């Protein structure tokens, strides 16, 4: 259970900050590109990665939430979790262990690996986006 006030703060402060900072970095990137300033474009990469990742990660995060809670997966997702983790309980244990091990900020993810066609647990530091850093498609994310 997540308290509504915490989610409101998270949305209005954290996600909004990533969005605003990404927009500012994109404007600077466009200006640097127009001026042919390759050094300026390269210098913006950390801001684009951090704020772009924060924006993407939180957009995915919001789609994972439900006022009534999600409950136990059903259908194809449940079948894939059982195939790749043995059971839903085993999946939760694996995901919990991975996210608890993150030092500082980061994300715990359930992702689909298009190379193996299996679900995997992955963690990313700070705001690194799952797909851009691992090639996996994010299905469910936990902001740590």
Curated annotation (Swiss-Prot):
Q: Give the principal location in a single coarse category.
A: mitochondrion
| One Pfam family here | Sod_Fe_C
Question: From which domain of life does this come?
Answer: Eukaryota
Cofactor note text: Binds 1 Mn(2+) ion per subunit.
The record's EC number reads 1.15.1.1
Name its co-factor(s): Mn(2+)
Q: Which reaction does it catalyse?
A: 2 superoxide + 2 H(+) = H2O2 + O2
Give GO MF terms, alphabetically.
manganese ion binding; superoxide dismutase activity
Q: Which GO terms describe its cellular component?
A: mitochondrial matrix
Alphabetized UniProt keyword annotations:
Manganese, Metal-binding, Mitochondrion, Oxidoreductase
KW Cytoplasm (keyword) present: no
Q: Which family does it belong to?
A: Belongs to the iron/manganese superoxide dismutase family.
Q: How does it assemble?
A: Homotetramer.
What does the function comment of this entry state?
Destroys superoxide anion radicals which are normally produced within the cells and which are toxic to biological systems.
Q: Which PANTHER family match?
A: SUPEROXIDE DISMUTASE 2, SUPEROXIDE DISMUTASE [MN], MITOCHONDRIAL
Q: Can you say what this protein is called?
A: Superoxide dismutase [Mn], mitochondrial
Q: Which species is this UniProt entry from?
A: Apostichopus californicus (California sea cucumber)
């Amino acid at each position: 259970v997540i308290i509504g006030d915490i989610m409101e703060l998270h949305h209005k402060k954290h996600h909004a900050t990533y969005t605003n900072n990404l927009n500012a970095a994109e404007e600077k990137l466009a200006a640097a590109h127009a001026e042919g300033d390759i050094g300026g474009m390269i210098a913006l990469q950390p801001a684009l990665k951090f704020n772009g990742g924060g924006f993407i990660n939180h957009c995915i995060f919001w789609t994972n939430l439900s006022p009534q809670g999600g409950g136990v997966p059903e259908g194809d997702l449940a079948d894939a979790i059982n195939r790749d983790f043995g059971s839903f309980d085993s999946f939760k244990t694996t995901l919990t262990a991975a996210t608890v091990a993150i030092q500082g900020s980061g994300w715990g993810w359930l992702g689909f690996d298009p190379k193996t066609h299996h679900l995997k647990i992955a963690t990313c530091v700070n705001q690194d986006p799952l797909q851009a850093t691992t090639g996996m498609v994010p299905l469910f994310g936990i902001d740590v």
